[in-house]
Amino acid sequence: MRIFIAFEGSFEAFDVEAHTSVGAIKQMIKDYFHIPLSEDKQGRWYLELMYAGAALRNSWSLSDVGISFCSTLKCFVKKEDKPTLYVFNAVTQEMMPIMENMSLLDKKVSDLRMLVTLRCGFPVSVYCLRTPTGLEMYDCNTLKDYQTDIGTTLRLDVWDGWKEFLMGCLLGQKPKVQHYLSKEGPVLKYGS
């Protein structure tokens, strides 16, 4: 069957089978238009096919999504940026991607900690950042001082005694939080 591909002002016909996968069609488009797709440390370039306003997955076949004879698919070259750094939050067990430009690597650890605080909500004074080898990172040093490169995963560790309090806050456990905030000696020591 014949379908049409709209790409950067061109409108080209392609003869394909109904069971052809979207991934195979992307390869045909890449070869026909000589599109250089690449991947590096900062991101990757890829093709996206759209039909009726929806992005098509590589594994789908044309017949799966109702694409018939003389249908028109739109094709775009898109860039997917990779995070500059990742920060593993030891409290929540979540990985935080840090999507800043590369100049972040030349900045001080304190600048990164401010970004992390804005993302996770933890006060700067309750945690430290560690390198992949476990070395504590000090605010006055630059990220380059710790051989931090694009894609490095750092670890956020909280100081002793803060993990339980922060988890109580994150999970909405009011009695646990009140216990940690109490000024009354018996409640602080023996509360629930």
Swiss-Prot record:
InterPro entries from the UniProt entry: ANKUB1, Ubiquitin-like_domsf
Q: Which SUPFAM superfamilies match?
A: Ubiquitin-like (SSF54236)
Q: Which Gene3D superfamilies match?
A: Phosphatidylinositol 3-kinase Catalytic Subunit, Chain A, domain 1
**Superkingdom as given in the UniProt entry:** Eukaryota
Instruction: Return the protein name.
Output: Protein ANKUB1
Look up and give the organism this protein is from.
Answer: Mus musculus
Q: What is the lineage of its organism?
A: Eukaryota, Metazoa, Chordata, Craniata, Vertebrata
